Amino acid sequence: MANKKIDHREEAVELLKQDAKRILQLIKVQMDNLTLPQCPAYEEVLDTQMYGLSREINFATRLGLIEPEEGKKLMSTLEKELSALHELSMSKK
């Protein structure tokens, strides 16, 4: 175990990416099965999840585990994926 070097930066980025993927999946399931994107419950879940991820990114940035630009890129990528998912959902209805 002493010989195993842990790269906390890579681990932090990977965990944040997993959380972003989880948010995308959660919203996809909600759009497919539960509510419309205009529904207040949908918007509340999305806002809460995005806020939580932004706080995680802020925390990791403050610890020096990720660069601020990397955090911004992660949020931007997730926002684009969610926007595409929203457009796809609206075109099906």
From Swiss-Prot:
InterPro entries given in the database record: UPF0358, UPF0358_sf
Report the SUPFAM superfamilies cross-referenced here: EF2458-like
User: So which domain of life are we looking at?
Assistant: Bacteria
Query: What would be one Pfam family of this protein?
Result: DUF1507
Query: Which NCBIfam families does the protein's record reference?
Result: PRK13666.1
Q: Which family does it belong to?
A: Belongs to the UPF0358 family.
**Can you say what this protein is called?**
UPF0358 protein LMHCC_1561
Organism classification: Bacteria, Bacillati, Bacillota, Bacilli, Bacillales
